[in-house]
Amino acid sequence: IGHFALQHNLVDKGIIDVAELEKALPGLQFSWKEGREGQIQMAMNDSVYGEELRTSEISNLVSIVAAIPAVRTHLLEQQRSLSKATSVVMDGRDIGTVVFPNAAHKFFLNAEPEIRAKRRYAEMQAKGIPASFEEVLANVIERDRMDSTRTIAPLAKAEDAVEIDTSTMDVKAVFQLLC
């Protein structure tokens, strides 16, 4: 939704035109669609987004957009609707506490901010997305602060979630542990 806001000129100097974004929400529909590499991904209005969602500009908007009550309500409805069609594995900062509080399996993956920033920075560099490590680290820390202190659906571990510190694990090790 942050990408949509940018593409439709609803963001000016980091400030979102909330009224216009709220008007657009009913037209934003989510579905499952085959992605560029053949995997099934979530699509918005039949478009699958990839690398364009990993930019610093989008990352800086995520927590701001997530704090808008109408956006949270719309996303909640859309995410729950998607799960009715098939079993899903979703990640997100409130998936186990708000979106699917009764999910059969919940994992709360965590790592030190510096480790998460290194991972994000390496991913961005590998994909040619410009950013400095300092910028990425600042974004990780700020998102954690904003998400854990927001009024609506703050970042929190669900009581029944298994917490896993992935600081010393690679993707394959985490996947093997979860399976």
Regions inferred by a protein language model and the residue ranges of each:
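N-terminal phosphate/diphosphate-binding loop that engages ATP/GTP or pyrophosphate donors
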Residues: 1-54
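Conserved, well-folded catalytic cores of nucleic-acid-processing
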Residues: 7-8, 28, 68, 82, ...
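Active-site phosphate-binding and catalytic loops of NTP-dependent enzymes
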Residues: 16, 31-34, 87, 146-153
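Glycine/charge-rich, flexible interdomain linkers and switch-proximal surface loops
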Residues: 24, 38-41, 92, 98, ...
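NTP-dependent small-molecule kinase module
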Residues: 43-53, 59, 121-127, 146, ...
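Residue-level signature of catalytic and energy-coupling elements of molecular machines
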Residues: 46, 75, 89, 140, ...
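ATP-dependent NMP and nucleoside kinases share a basic, alpha-helical "lid"
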Residues: 50-62, 66-127
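Anionic, Ser/Thr-rich low-complexity intrinsically disordered regions
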Residues: 94-95, 101, 108-118, 127-139, ...
